[in-house]
Amino acid sequence: MAPLRGWCAKGRRLPARVPHGHWKTLTFLAGLRADGVVAPCVFDGPINGTCFRAYVEQILVPALRPGDVVILDNLGSHKGAAVRHAIRAAGAHMLFLPPYSPDLNPIEQVFAKLKHLLRKAAKRTLEDTWRTIGDLIHAFPPKECQRYLVNAGYASA
C-alpha cells in the first residue's frame, strides 16, 4: 500500500515512489478479543461466500470459545446457513449490525490502524505485504483492543 500523504518544504515537489499498473485487492479477515487480534487471514482478492465459509470453518471456529459473540455486518456471504451453523456449533452467538454502522463494529478500528501501518511500511509486493501484516498483528496490545471494544459500546472499562 502506498502512503497517501507526504511532507516537504513549501514550494518544493515531494519526491515519492508511486505504484503503476493495476491495483491488487487483498482481503483481511480477523476477530477481535479484549486480549488481542485472533484468527487473522489474508485472501488474495475479494472474498465470496465460499471463501468466507472456509475462513469461518477452518480458522475462526477453532479460535472461538463458548459464549463468544461474533459481530457481522450485512454482507451476503456472512448470512449463509453453513456459516451460521458453524458459529453456533462452536457455542458462539451471532450479532448482525444494522446497515451502514461501522462505528458499532470494533474490528473496523483495527482495520483502520492496520491500513495506516501498511501504508507507512509501503511494501510493493504481495508477499512483503502478507509478511508485514503477520508482523503487525502483534501491534495491537490487550489494552488497545479493550479500548476498541469500549469505544464501540460492547464492554465497560
Where do the PLM segments sit?
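Short functional hotspots at interaction and active-site rims
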Residues: M1-A157
